[in-house]
Amino acid sequence: MDWLTILGISVALAMDAFAVALAAGAVISPITGRHLFRLGFHFGLFQALMPIGGWLLGMTVQKWISAYDHWIAFGLLAYVGGRMVHEAFEEDDEEKTPSDPTKGMTMVMLSVATSIDAFAVGLSIAMLGVSVWLPATVIGLVAGVLTVAGMLLGRRLGEKWGKRVEICGGLVLCLIGLKILLEHTLLK
């Protein structure tokens, strides 16, 4: 597999992570280096591990995974996106802070949801009979870098537009989930 192909696949896979990071950056204030590291590291790690998992399992579970992967991604993104929209409409409370998408189960759910497509890429790489290690490394690094860039851009948008960006970010997550669902059901 040549470098241009690997880079193209990496950028394409990182687009969902970038969009989610954009939404996360809009709701975290202030964004610290710790936030950037946590989300960038975890999104990159999951994006790198999923193709390896897909490659290792090969064709063994492809039919089972492909039957449900889009539902899993849709459910996770719709849940997190819906929660973001809900929190944006709640009354302002000085003691209440928005949930931090770079912590706990929210971060894990987002990491899984944005990297499920990378699992399918790993299955494809296995069918080509090539090594997965270089593509997985590049996929993870590109996802990590674009996640950090998305968070920083999201912060700028959040500072300028406030709750409107939080609502839009939540809706974007729901729409990404819907897009994944439609691509695997109606548009197949």
Swiss-Prot record:
Locate the transmembrane regions by residue number: 3-23, 39-59, 65-85, 104-124, 125-145, 167-187
InterPro entries reported for this sequence: Mntp/YtaF, Put_MntP
Keywords (alphabetical) are: Cell inner membrane, Cell membrane, Ion transport, Manganese, Membrane, Transmembrane, Transmembrane helix, Transport
Q: How does it sit in the membrane?
A: Multi-pass membrane protein
> Superkingdom of the source?
Bacteria
Q: Which GO terms describe its molecular function?
A: manganese ion transmembrane transporter activity
**A Pfam family the protein falls into:** Mntp
Q: Any idea where this protein resides? A: Cell inner membrane
A cellular component annotation (GO) from this entry? plasma membrane
Function per UniProt: Probably functions as a manganese efflux pump.
Which protein family is named in the record? Belongs to the MntP (TC 9.B.29) family.
Protein name (Swiss-Prot/TrEMBL):
Putative manganese efflux pump MntP
